[in-house]
Structures are given as structure tokens and as C-alpha cells.
Design a protein with these regions (language model features):
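Glycine/proline-rich, positively charged
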Residues: 1-79, 86, 96, 146
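Structured C-terminal cap/extension of enzyme domains
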Residues: 86-191
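Generic, ordered loop/turn and secondary-structure boundary motif
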Residues: 80-81, 105
Length: 191
């Protein structure tokens, strides 16, 4: 009931008839999970949302994937955070959308949400050797969008210049598969 009321209020405030995507951010508590999923299904059936999804991580997100009722999933993925790589492929085979967060490893070390461990793996794997004139962020973004089953990636930004650089980088397209394979090989060697 709270989910449905919240969506109705949002629709009124947004002055629209439906949401494009409605997703859980994190797993609902186990005791409310079935009811919460049914609420999303009801909202979709009633035309209040076009698509439903879940934003979570393994292992929790696997339960929702197994339900086979969701249109999209959001989770982290990059060269430095590849835990969900095979899940992206699996979802692509099911025709389910994937929204990637953390596609450039959550930013620069020492700023924002960056994980120094991830960037330490970059250094251990000597990935700077593969940059070929790119900076690390362009390289990571282009690596992320190289996954053939990925639907889209969400890139956070601290300023408009970041947005311009990210759009330019994405416009250059994915990295060569041979480069991506070398990244995976090097990172596996330091894992």
C-alpha cells in the first residue's frame, strides 16, 4: 500500500500518468518482499509504470533475477568491479535491461565514493600501459560500455566538465575486444 500510494503521489507531483521505470533500491525486507513485488506488478499492470526493476548487488539480486518478472536490473560494473559481469550476459540473453552504476569505478581515489582497493588493482595490473592516449576515466567508461549485453550506464558527475568529457568518451565507442581481454587477464593475475 505504501508503494502504491507513493507512486500515486509522485505521479501527481510530476504531472504525468506513468513512470518509465520503477525499481527497488535495495531489497525489501524478506517479510514484505512478496507483497512489495506484487505492488510493482500491479502498478505495471495498471499502466502506472512501463517497466519494473531492482537495484541491488549479488548475492541478493540473484533472488530477483530468478523471479523472472523484472524488466531491468541496476548494479555496479566496471573493469575494476566485475562481480556482475556474467549476470549482465545472462540478463541480456533473457532480454532484460541492465543499468550500470559505478562504471568508472566510482570516481577518483580520495574523492567521492572511490574505493582505493579497486584503484590499487589498477596499479598492480599496470593498466596504465593500455591507455593509448586516454585518461583512466575514459578508458574505464569505454571498457564498461564494451560489454555487448549492457543496456546503459549511469555516470555520476561533480561538474558539467565531467559530463562533457564522459559524453565525448562514450561517443568514441567501446574498446577493442582484444584490449578488454587483456584488461581481464591482467586483473585476474593480481586478484
Amino acid at each position: 500500500e505504501n508503494i502504491i500510494n507513493g507512486v500515486e503521489l509522485s505521479l501527481k507531483r510530476l504531472k504525468t500518468d506513468y513512470l518509465d521505470l520503477l525499481q527497488f533500491h535495495g531489497s525489501p525486507p524478506t517479510e514484505f518482499r512478496e507483497e512489495a513485488v506484487q505492488a510493482l506488478l500491479d502498478l505495471k499492470r495498471d499502466g502506472k509504470t512501463r517497466f519494473i526493476g531492482v537495484s541491488d548487488v549479488l548475492p541478493t539480486v540473484a533472488h530477483f533475477v530468478d523471479m523472472r518478472v523484472f524488466d531491468a536490473f541496476q548494479f555496479p560494473y566496471s573493469a575494476l568491479d566485475s562481480a556482475h559481469e556474467s549476470l549482465i550476459t545472462q540478463l541480456g540473453q533473457f532480454g532484460v535491461g541492465t543499468l550500470i552504476r559505478g562504471g568508472i569505478a566510482r570516481g577518483e581515489p580520495g574523492h567521492g565514493l572511490a574505493d582505493p582497493t579497486l584503484w590499487g588493482n589498477w596499479d598492480l595490473a599496470n593498466l596504465d600501459e593500455l591507455l593509448d592516449g586516454m585518461n583512466r576515466f575514459e578508458f574505464l567508461l569505454r571498457y564498461t560500455i564494451s560489454h555487448p549485453d549492457l543496456s546503459t550506464t549511469i555516470i555520476g558527475s561533480m561538474n558539467p566538465d565531467h559530463i562533457r568529457r564522459n559524453v565525448t568518451a562514450a561517443g568514441r565507442g567501446p574498446l577493442l575486444e582484444s584490449t578488454c581481454a587483456e584488461v581481464r587477464r591482467r586483473l585476474a593475475a593480481v586478484a
